[in-house]
């Protein structure tokens, strides 16, 4: 029998308990052993909940119990999750987590400890919720050199942008609805400013490229400046606006960024709606592949965590090699990355386009019926720094968004 402990009985932790209880027989068959939850750690009490039978408030009870071989960390945040995880690994216990903040910050260190102890630190649920992506990167795609990852990695922002596009809501209205429906936190900053997606693309890039990508080095821009008018312009082009997390190999370098991007129907991420996530990967042998599914939520995330528990159970005394070196990967300066740009500008298109062309060369200019006093244009591909320099020469700029077609 394999005994596990769950740290945290919140949304994901309670989901882990539920999944193990609900699918107990099939999980045990796949693990080739019986998996039993011996402890659940939480500061709170849960009167009337069956979890009370295994509930403890002192982490040392778990740490000092030699029967516990797998620890499931679903506490979230950096502290004390980091200290508890490190102590568990150093004590020879496998750890599975859904905590992207912890993995992005301390992943290299924790993977190294697990390697030295010949145990495992697994984090499938940290990047795509219920979407299997870490395991494919680490095993199924090992024959490939990955040269591009593009993802919709945050369900909250995708839900907001979908509501703006489908229902014509402005940003604040869509955010409020997301909060009312439980898709956004009371403090949504990590989601809407792109920080959550940034940590996830850092983890995926580290595994894909075999070196450590520091999330602090990734250019990150959220969706708070996207307006209902921006959405209307995109729709007039047969396009949609998505918060994309991207990392890409360019010649001998790599870049990574998170930002709103206008994409059209030729992009496989175009049709990803609501709280769903999707991750597009290009390999030099495989070509294109896309992973799609529920990117968040209690049971989808718990499903990925329990899959890691089963993996740990099958490799109790053997470390699963992770292609994640502690060697830092130096990213390209984002100012040298080339993109096309959508620009909304005040004024009459017929009068202003000569000035625009004098700055950016020939552009694709257009207007949308019903929107007055402004027009829009799309530039050719150019380095980010050239665009920033050019845009300062024009007055009345209302919006700028990168274009992926």
What do the predicted segments below correspond to?
Residues 7, 73-75, 98, 105, ...:
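Structural motif
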Residues 68, 115-196, 203:
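Rossmann-like NAD(P)H-binding beta-loop-alpha module
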């Amino acid at each position: 029998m394999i005994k596990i402990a769950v740290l945290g009985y919140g949304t994901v932790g309670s989901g882990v308990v539920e999944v193990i209880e609900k699918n107990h027989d099939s999980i045990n068959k796949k693990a080739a052993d019986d998996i039993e939850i011996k402890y659940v750690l939480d500061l709170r009490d849960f009167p009337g909940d069956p979890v009370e039978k295994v509930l403890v408030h002192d982490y040392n009870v778990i740490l000092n119990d030699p029967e516990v071989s797998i620890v499931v960390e679903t506490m979230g945040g950096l502290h004390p999750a980091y200290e508890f995880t490190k102590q568990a690994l150093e004590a020879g216990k496998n750890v599975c987590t859904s905590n992207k903040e912890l993995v992005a910050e301390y992943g290299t260190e924790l993977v190294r400890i697990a390697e030295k102890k010949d145990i495992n630190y697994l984090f499938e649920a940290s990047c795509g919720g219920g979407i299997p992506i870490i395991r494919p990167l680490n095993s199924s795609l090992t024959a490939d050199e990955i040269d591009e990852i593009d993802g919709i990695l945050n369900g909250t922002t995708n839900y907001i942008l979908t509501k703006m596009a489908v229902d014509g809501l402005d940003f604040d209205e869509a955010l409020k609805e997301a909060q009312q429906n439980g898709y956004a936190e009371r403090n949504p900053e990590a989601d809407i400013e792109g920080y959550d997606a940034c940590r996830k693309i850092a983890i995926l890039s580290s595994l894909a490229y075999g070196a450590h990508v520091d999330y602090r080095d990734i250019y990150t821009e959220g969706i708070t400046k996207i307006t209902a008018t921006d959405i209307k312009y995109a729709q007039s082009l047969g396009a949609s606006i998505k918060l994309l997390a991207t990392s890409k190999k360019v010649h001998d370098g790599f870049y990574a960024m998170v930002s709103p991007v206008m994409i059209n129907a030729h992009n496989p991420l175009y049709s990803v709606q609501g709280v769903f996530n999707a991750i597009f990967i290009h390999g030099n042998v495989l070509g294109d592949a896309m992973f799609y599914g529920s990117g968040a939520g209690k049971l989808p995330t718990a499903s990925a965590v329990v899959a890691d528990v089963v993996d740990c159970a099958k490799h109790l005394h053997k470390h699963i090699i992770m292609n994640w070196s502690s060697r830092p990967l130096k990213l390209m300066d984002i100012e040298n990355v080339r993109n096309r740009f959508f620009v909304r500008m005040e004024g009459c298109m017929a009068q202003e386009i000569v000035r625009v062309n004098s700055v950016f060369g020939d552009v694709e200019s257009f207007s949308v019926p019903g929107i007055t006093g402004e027009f829009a244009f799309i530039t050719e591909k150019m380095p980010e720094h050239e665009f920033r320099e050019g845009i300062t020469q024009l007055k009345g700029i209302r919006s700028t968004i990168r274009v992926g077609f």
